Amino acid sequence: MKKKIHKVTFLIDKKNNWIKSYLSKNNLLFKNRYSYKFSNNIDTIVDQDILFIVNYTKVLSDSFLQGNRLNLVIHASDLPKDRGFAPVANQVLRGKNEIYISLIEANKKVDTGCIFLKQKFYLKGTDLYDEIRSKTAIAMIKIINSFLKQYPSKINRKFQKGKSNFNKKRTDKDNKLNINRSIKKQFHILRLSSNKNFPAYFYNQGEKYILKIYKDKKK
């Protein structure tokens, strides 16, 4: 008897699609059991066995979610802690190096769905923006593959328990440095700044200065 090939789609925000290149480079496993596709257009997604919602910030309607058998959100925090936007960045700002990845069921209320899996990865405290992003992506791929290995026979849901908090969307102001504070006290802000897209900056005597950060590769 021919095995069923489960249809899997990754819904990725068009304006926040950096994860796609990692998913492409790091082969998704179990291709004999799953067919994979990527989309940033919900109109092209229907009747999927599994929909992974990755870095997608728009609200999805109940009717859309009901059109798929299982809708999963990958969220980089120890839910119910750090619901909302930029969970990794907000944890880095608090000095955390142990970061969880939660795989949850999508529902109407943001980041409140039942938990299927939790895994964690570690930062060094010296990682810069690109390194943090890379480690996050690798951890996301790992939890995806772990779930696909278990599906459909060995999956369990657990309700979220404990205190929760909700992080607001980060803005340009979050990259602003205070020239009256030390670099050490603001190092996490520098770590989270993207030299290309949103570098750190400060004002002095009415002028705005851009500050970019690199590791010395010569040492």
Model-found features: residue ranges?
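One-carbon transfer enzymes
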Residues: M1-K219
